């Protein structure tokens, strides 16, 4: 940040961080100061934050608070990982945020600096369609029940069906999509929740709902495939 306006907002964020003692606000401030990345504004806007808080609240109510590991696909700037790890209602051992964009990993680590330093957060560059989920998610069956895979970018996957087939049966999932067809990057939007449910069959549905936003409606499903 370099302009007087930028410094003005930086001072506000720093003051709020000192007042609230919020490690998340401190991490956000540090990231804004060190990285000249306009997309941070989009990642932290009210619609994005509202969708992430909706996921956190619904996840807590439907699947509980204790997770051994969370794999976030299409994790972008790492905001969802930060929201979950800073939420005192949850006990989460580790979060891995993956995005295909190589510019995202450093930003995600910075936004999650508090937990990255503690070994509880990691960011990697990878294409979610190329991951061997059976190998990555294999382990102790007891622990596996507490593993969660999150994909809030379903609208970005043109070959969504192929990706979904790769997820092992019984895996706990939290999925989001939307009907925002106006965005060129959204190649797999759905018109309604019923269509999203047909795309994401689950043996156990823990939550299925929708949230109207200003320009679109976001859909979410939580359950075991």
Residues of each region from the PLM?
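C-terminal substrate-binding/active-site "lid" region of AdoMet-derived donor-dependent transferases
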Residues: 158-225
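A short acidic, amphipathic alpha-helical/loop segment
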Residues: 83-84, 135-138, 160-166
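Conserved SAM-binding motif I beta-strand of class I
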Residues: 92-99
């Amino acid at each position: 940040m370099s302009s007087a306006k930028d410094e003005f907002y930086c001072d506000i964020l720093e003051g709020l961080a000192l007042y609230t003692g919020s490690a998340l606000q401190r991490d956000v401030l540090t990231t804004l100061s060190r990285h000249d990345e306009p997309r941070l504004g989009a990642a932290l806007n009210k619609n994005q934050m509202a969708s992430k808080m909706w996921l956190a609240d619904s996840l807590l109510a439907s699947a509980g608070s204790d997770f051994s590991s969370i794999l976030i696909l299409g994790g972008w700037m790492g905001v969802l990982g930060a929201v979950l790890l800073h939420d005192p209602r949850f006990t989460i051992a580790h979060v891995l945020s993956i995005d295909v964009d190589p510019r995202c990993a450093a930003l995600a680590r910075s936004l999650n600096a508090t937990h990255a330093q503690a070994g509880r957060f990691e960011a990697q560059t990878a294409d979610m369609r190329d991951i061997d989920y059976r190998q990555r998610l294999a382990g102790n069956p007891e622990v596996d029940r507490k593993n969660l895979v999150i994909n809030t970018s379903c609208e970005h996957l043109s070959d969504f069906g192929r990706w979904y087939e790769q997820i092992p049966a019984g895996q706990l999932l939290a999925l989001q999509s939307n009907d925002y067809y106006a965005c060129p990057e959204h190649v797999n939007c759905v018109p309604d929740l019923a269509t999203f449910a047909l795309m994401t069959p689950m043996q156990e549905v823990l939550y299925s709902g929708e949230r109207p936003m200003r320009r679109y409606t976001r859909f979410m499903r939580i359950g075991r495939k």
